[in-house]
Amino acid sequence: MDTSLGARLAESIGVHGPMPFDDWVEACLYDPDGGFYASGGGAGRRNDFLTSPEVGPLFGAVLARWMDSRWEVLGRPEGFTVIEVAAGIGTLARSVVAAGPACLAGGRYVMVERSASSRDEQPTGGCLSSVPDLSVLVGEGPVDHGVVLANELLDNLAFGLLEVIDGRWHQVVIDGPHGVSGEFRMVPGEATEPPVPVDAGSRPSGTRIPVQTAAAAWVAEAIGLVGAGSVLVVDYTSTTPEMADRPSGQWLRTYRGHERGGEPTEVPGSQDVTVEVAVDQLPPGAVADTQAAFLRRYGIDNLVEAGRRLWEERAHLGDLEAIRARSRVTEAKALLDPTGLGGFTVLEWVCS
């Protein structure tokens, strides 16, 4: 009996009919027995895509400065809590803790990660702890003072798709395997309204937009969790009208082994499925900036200069400290690149 994810999805569609696109993405990414992340996919040099924390420890060192700045604004409270969602194997947590932010001297750093295999690789001890879902912390009640942060999470939350057909928006759903190839297909579903005003009548049939209900709900939940502090997300972003004006293949992307993957319907669970984050579908009130500007505001240039001086002092030794110092220069280039990671958007909601 075929128990693969594809076979199970085909069986479900055969019984219940075409599947909403967001349910399809959820299964392809997070099914515990065949989803992309449960099967070992993820960020890192040996995996499928590279995020800012995997570039090196410099990103975490700058975020540690941001955390301290928020702690200072709140009056240096005891018990300051840092919550990192989609923490993976703890790469960012390691870098932040290694930087030694003052806010964690009497505080805690909680990694939230739904993948059990990733949690098994996370660092432990000291101020660090781990939970499988943000709801665990929500159940404990509001965090008096702290921050919630997520790097490239929202683009990986399940999202729906709408498509213009004869001047109206329709849901996009997934139908079961058909024909000799046995491929899943995206087909039109029921007519519906878009999440924000985007005129379908003025756009050609086939125009698509994402519906990012889960991303909006996540931000709202994170804001509600923090009594005083901030919610910070880093991601590649756009707006719903902007995406309506572009081919969907430009903003709905798949990745496998550091390269672009195939169609989102191709071999369920074999590739990452991502979407640009529509900021106009998120809760209002965020302060937005580019990653490059954010990192400069919190001292990346000073850290790089300090690393350059340390390298000059210790280059003749060639020890690990000297090599790490030299690495800051190349890390900064990647993190600040306006055509790459530096062009990502940083959104911060201040909670009080």
Each predicted region: which residue ranges?
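Rossmann-like AdoMet
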Residues: 1-144, 293, 299-302, 307, ...
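Active-site flanking residues adjacent to catalytic metal/cofactor-binding acidic residues
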Residues: 83, 112, 148-151, 234
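Short helix/loop capping segments that flank catalytic or ligand/cofactor-binding pockets
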Residues: 120, 157-159, 241-242
